[in-house]
Amino acid sequence: MTFAFANAVWLRGTYADVHPLGFAVALGAVALAVRWALRGDARALATGTVLAGAAVAIDNTTVLILLGGVVATLARRWPVAVVARSLAIAVLVVLAAYAYLPLRSAYVTVHRADPTLALGIPPGRPFWDDHHPSTPEGFRSLVAGTEWGPGETLVVLLTPAVLRRAADRFGAEVSADEPQGLLVVALIGLGFVIAQAPLAGVGLVLAAVVPALFGAAYPAEADPERYVLALYAVIALGVAVAADRTVRAFGRQKPAVALGVVCALLAVVSVRDVVRGHELFAYRDNPEASELGARVAAQTRDGAVVVAPWDWATALAYHAYVDRALGRRIVVCALPREHLEEYAAWMREHQVTIVSEGAPDLPGYSTRKLTGGSPQVYEIVKQ
């Protein structure tokens, strides 16, 4: 409960994103690694290895979490045959997932499935063919994020500057989500785990801390809080272990009373988190994305080019290519000036519009406001 209703976790459960799915699978793999460390269950080791492959196939940033799982498995000597078989399956899962990327990219390009190709935009734009991974450079860029330097981030991960940045970025929110001394309780619980099984405990700490440090340090990350999901999970585990030890220590005579008191205290924290995050209930009925799509459909001509930055282009692309509600309109994910030189050519065959909060400044062009609301839609016209 303390994990599920933490604001940072709950918020990321309200929308579709690959990262929480990858996190859940990776956390399952780490849990099985800890089970192997504590009990020597070879089936847990094999299943966890395959799950680790699935996690990397879903989202390659899960390797930051899985590092902790690898450390936990070192508590026992690996059974060579079991590890070899499960690792082979995991590698096949990863290869199959990543082989799909260039194959699909090549198909989209050959069949001109991406509508932006008709505008003369080179392959590699979001939604249909992000980074154009059918080329080696595009594949490396998409999978490894090479244009943003993740390697440089990893090199400085444990430096004092990154530690301070992580504390500044996540400290206040974590403290708000885990009040009334729960962080201290969690540390005590993790201390018990490390005392009982050092490598398993260290692995859990690494699984929690390494992704959070990366999220704080990576310059291209727009949503660093998604990297702290494992941190919240391990905090919840620490609280659970400490609660269990408390019940065992003080409940020898009246275990039901001790259990009831501990559960009541945790329930108070969970209720507080629910009240604190009550506004998140309204997110399921948030109409902003659908209203933007409706405004674009109502006030632009079929076949229009709709240029929008990422935050609004994603909603419009879903409206256009999933809901099929925008007809032949072409959604271009770009800043208003990014294709300034191409606008004249596009305007010969299309109405060209910009989604913007306020009239965009486009040298050589004027704009005509088509809609109200937030954001607005503007038509580009020649001066």
Region spans (language model):
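Aromatic- and kink-enriched transmembrane "portal" helix at the membrane-lumen/periplasm boundary
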Residues: 1-23, 57-60, 212-225, 271-274
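Transmembrane helices and adjacent periplasmic/lumenal helix-loop junctions
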Residues: 8, 50-72, 97
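Membrane-interface transmembrane helices that cradle and orient dolichyl/undecaprenyl
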Residues: 27-47, 55, 73-77
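Hydrophobic alpha-helical membrane-interfacial segments at the cytosolic entry of transmembrane helices
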Residues: 49-51, 78-102, 116-125, 261-265
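Hydrophobic, aromatic-rich transmembrane alpha-helices
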Residues: 174-199
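Hydrophobic/aromatic-rich transmembrane helices and adjacent perimembrane loops
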Residues: 220-250
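Transmembrane alpha-helical segments
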Residues: 242-245, 259-284
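Luminal/periplasmic acceptor-recognition loop/helix of membrane-associated glycosyltransferases
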Residues: 307-310, 322-383
